From Swiss-Prot:
Its EC number is 1.8.3.2. Its cofactor is FAD. Keywords: Disulfide bond, FAD, Flavoprotein, Oxidoreductase. The lineage of its organism: Viruses, Varidnaviria, Bamfordvirae, Nucleocytoviricota, Megaviricetes. It comes from Frog virus 3 (isolate Goorha) (FV-3). Disulfide bonds join 74-77. It catalyses: 2 R'C(R)SH + O2 = R'C(R)S-S(R)CR' + H2O2. Residues 24-128 form the ERV/ALR sulfhydryl oxidase domain. FAD-dependent sulfhydryl oxidase that catalyzes disulfide bond formation. It holds the Pfam family Evr1_Alr. One of its GO terms (molecular function) is thiol oxidase activity. This is Putative FAD-linked sulfhydryl oxidase 088R.
């Protein structure tokens, strides 16, 4: 991975009631950002550790990525994701860097379908802290109001 020349990436996080989201909480804007953050952060952490994946890690990453569709609440998104992942040659995904690159490639295929911007690998490296080896500069935290369950 190459060093970053993007002067750190900044972001903005806002809270929106799920009823205000396009297609509600189960549409792409409801579940997508958190799911992508989880996927990319895990892959970034493995890339930062460096080296080759163990056979167990390879199997676990393949299984997790292949089966993530079960967590996607949007039916058309789920089908599209399954189509993307079914076409992946996991045999060549043998390092953390390659896992990270794969997650960026998958995300960009989804972005293309949704007419969203393509994110370069270099920008993703900056966003998820592979350039500094410190991980993402920001995190997403969610705390549910559980008093409604009492």
């Amino acid at each position: 991975m190459h060093g970053c020349n993007c002067n750190r990436v900044s972001g903005h996080l806002s809270a929106v009631r799920s009823s205000g989201l396009e297609n509600g909480p189960f549409g792409p804007s409801g579940f997508g950002p958190s799911m992508w953050f989880t996927m990319h952060s895990g892959a970034a952490e493995r890339a930062i550790r460096g080296g080759y994946l163990t056979e167990n890690e390879k199997a676990a990453w393949e299984s997790w990525l292949r089966n993530l569709w079960v967590c996607i609440p949007c039916e058309s998104c789920r089908r599209h994701y399954m189509g993307i992942v079914n076409a992946v040659d996991f045999g060549s995904v043998n390092t953390g860097d390659k896992v990270f690159r794969l997650t960026v490639d998958i995300h960009n295929m989804v972005n293309a379908r949704l007419n969203k911007p393509h994110v370069t690998l270099q920008k993703a490296i900056c966003i998820y802290g592979l350039d500094t080896k410190l991980g993402p500069a920001s995190t997403i935290t969610f705390r549910a109001n559980t008093s409604t369950f009492n």
